């Protein structure tokens, strides 16, 4: 018989995923509601991994229309400082890459693993509302201060190969879990048993109902 573990929600996301930004209020609400009953972890998916630095312009042209759909469906708002880059692709100096925000999250989770969902949400707010460049080391300083993480330690780790490898391990794990798009939410109940709870944006009521259904099934199995 397989080992029972504390049921764990894995939220697979990418810092640059606009739909994940729209999903942030849903997953943070779920994390708050199920605190103590479920464990939570966030895995970065490595959505943007250019072989060489690639300018934001092609992505910006897509976002010019797509962001409105995200706002309409989720109720989230993109900030003017972010949208400036979206609507001035010829002037922006952004070269998006998922690696650094993934490394930053790996470091932050090490200090406060129970806050992983909130940290991921804050990283996305920093980009999509405040318009911070997540490839710039300074984009993280306010979060390091907010979460009371030792600054020198954080920045040493941000430049280290060790934490880059941790981020790449998460990218590989997300692929191994057969995640093909973001956001994605999985619930692990045994060493090898996972339930897919969300693939793409999912509203709070739907996600909560799916979680409760799985938890009810687990409890039923354990009493039989």
Question: Residue spans of the language-model regions?
Answer:
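A generic fold-level signal
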Residues: 4, 99, 179-180
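Structural alpha/beta surface segment adjacent to cysteine/selenocysteine redox centers
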Residues: 24-127
